[in-house]
Each structure stands twice: as structure tokens, then as C-alpha cells.
């Protein structure tokens, strides 16, 4: 297949503003968009900058805006993308260079929700904290998050309010709020009940469409909201 790949480029050392550059490529229908980016970097322009790691949809490193939607470049097939493909950096986060964005703010919000198991008490049998299949199911969906930022950077509330904690942080808070073994339930709900927490969600559902892991992000936000209301009585 002959492919026309348009990439929004930006070099802070040379450019005043981002601009589009077009590359002619030949690819197989089964190739991924990441393969096209590799072609450009390896054979046409070694200055092209982007982030990637596992190339198997597990690490979340190569999330970017492809044909107008947030996707993982390593998962999106050329046959689905078409012969004219546009690629640009994620929205709402600072652009470092080309397709590379600054994830520090995103990760700060993630860390702020205490995304780890807090369980200081001694288990009943002194060995393990048992959990039934039903208890595990409560957070099964949100445990799939790979921190690609596709959901958060697809959110129009996040675009206009950088203080909003964002869908990804709420998803990871949900994962531990719903965990029967965790003992920081109230602390996380207090964080989520902040003015820039769950109440900022406007149920646009962009986050659900963007998630490459199929997480129902909006439902997770609703469930955290319900927990806050239940706690308040």
C-alpha cells in the first residue's frame, strides 16, 4: 500500500510553532502506525521524535492523536487507518518535541490519588488478605489501566482546566477504593471529592472511546461519585 503520512512536527530549538510534514511510504495492511513512524525515523528523517517501548499495547508509551482520535500507534492497523494518515501529539499536555509530550503533570495527578494498596493491619490468619471473586470483580475493569493518558488527553474538561485530576487518575483511585483489602478508602474519597475531582466530569464519554484497554471510564467515575455520596450519608 502507498501511504501518505502527515506528522505534526515541532522542534523547540528551531520552530516558532508546530507545522505539518508529509512522508510517502509503502506499507503492508497488517503494519501498525508505529511501523510507519519507524520507517520515517530509520530511513527518511532521524530527527523525528516519539515515545515507544513494548510495541504490543501493554506499556502505553505510544499514545498519540491518529486520524483525529487518541490511539496507541502500536495497535492501530494501517488497513484501518487508510492510505492518508495524520499523526500528532496528545492534546492538553505540553509538547516537548514532535510527538513527544511532557507527562510529568499527568503522573503527578496519578500519584496524588495514592495508587497503591494501603493495608497495615494483620490478616485474620496472619498470612494473606483473602478476597472473593465477587470482591475482585468490583475493580477488575479499572485494574487494566496502562497509564497511556489517552483518556485524560481526550477529555475537554482537562483541556480547559489543567487542575482537573482527570479520568486516568480517577480510574486508578477507583481501582483501590473498590478493593476490599485496602484501608485508605476514606482518604481517597476525600481526594476525589475535591472541587477538581470527580465533580468536574461532564460525561462527554471521550474517555471511554479513547481507552485502548476498553475500560468503561465514565462508569468508574460514577461509581466513585456514588461512594462519596454513600459516605456522606
Model-identified regions with their sequence ranges:
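Active-site phosphate-binding and catalytic loops of NTP-dependent enzymes
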Residues: 45-51
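Short, contiguous acidic and Ser/Thr-rich linear segments
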Residues: 20-32
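DNA-contacting interfaces and partner/effector-binding or oligomerization modules
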Residues: 51, 61-66
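Short strand-turn-strand beta-turns centered on an Asx-Gly dipeptide
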Residues: 26, 65-68
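Ferredoxin-type iron-sulfur electron-transfer modules in oxidoreductases and energy-metabolism complexes
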Residues: 30-43, 88-233
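Eukaryote-biased recognition of intrinsically disordered, low-complexity regulatory segments
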Residues: 1-22
Amino acid at each position: 500500500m502507498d501511504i501518505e503520512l502527515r506528522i505534526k512536527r515541532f522542534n523547540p530549538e528551531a520552530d516558532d510553532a508546530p507545522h505539518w510534514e508529509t512522508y510517502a511510504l509503502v506499507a503492508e495492511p497488517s503494519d501498525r502506525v508505529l511501523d510507519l513512524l519507524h520507517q520515517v525515523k530509520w530511513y527518511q528523517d532521524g530527527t523525528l521524535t516519539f515515545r515507544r517501548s513494548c510495541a504490543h499495547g501493554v506499556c502505553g508509551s505510544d499514545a498519540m492523536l491518529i486520524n483525529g482520535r487518541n490511539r496507541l500507534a502500536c495497535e492501530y492497523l494501517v488497513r484501518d487507518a487508510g492510505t492518508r494518515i495524520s499523526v500528532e501529539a496528545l492534546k492538553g499536555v505540553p509538547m516537548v518535541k514532535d510527538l513527544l509530550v511532557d507527562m510529568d503533570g499527568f503522573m503527578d495527578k496519578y500519584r496524588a490519588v495514592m495508587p497503591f494498596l494501603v493495608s497495615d493491619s494483620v490478616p485474620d490468619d496472619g498470612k494473606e488478605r483473602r478476597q472473593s471473586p465477587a470482591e475482585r470483580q468490583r475493580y477488575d475493569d479499572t485494574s487494566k489501566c496502562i497509564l497511556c493518558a489517552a483518556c485524560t488527553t481526550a477529555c475537554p474538561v482537562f483541556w480547559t482546566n489543567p487542575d482537573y485530576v482527570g479520568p486516568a487518575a480517577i480510574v486508578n483511585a477507583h481501582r483501590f477504593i473498590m478493593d476490599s483489602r485496602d484501608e485508605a478508602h476514606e482518604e481517597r474519597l476525600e481526594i476525589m471529592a475535591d472541587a477538581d475531582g470527580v465533580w468536574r466530569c461532564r460525561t462527554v464519554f471521550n474517555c471511554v472511546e479513547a481507552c485502548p484497554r476498553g475500560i468503561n471510564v465514565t462508569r468508574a467515575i460514577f461509581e466513585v461519585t456514588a461512594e462519596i455520596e454513600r459516605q456522606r450519608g
